[in-house]
From Swiss-Prot:
Location of this chain's protein in the cell: Secreted
Stated name of the protein: Early lactation protein
Molecular functions (GO terms): serine-type endopeptidase inhibitor activity
Glycosites: N14, N31, N42
InterPro entries in the cross-refs: Kunitz_BPTI, Kunitz_BPTI_sf, Prtase_inh_Kunz-CS, TFPI/VKTCI-like
Disulfide bond positions: C23-C73, C32-C56, C48-C69
One GO location term (cellular component): extracellular space
Lineage: Eukaryota, Metazoa, Chordata, Craniata, Vertebrata
BPTI/Kunitz inhibitor domain: residues covered: 23-73
Amino acid sequence: EKCLDQIQVNSLENLSLLVPSLCLLPPVRGNCSSQILHYFYNTTSRTCETFIYSGCNGNRNNFNSEEYCLKTCRRNKNRNNNN
């Protein structure tokens, strides 16, 4: 059990080296009344997924398009594969 905890911690630490810190944030809907389909980077699935954004507040893991989300949060993927 201790080994599993250590693996999870090491995995998160390594992920933070590969992914910009804003992409590690959980999706936050915000507290306004709009319902806008936005994207956030999911560190578990390592892809961008949709969520409903209220139009205000929230955090920086919030993108208008899947393309921009992937471009921002997976930008180091090819660079790391070449090393």
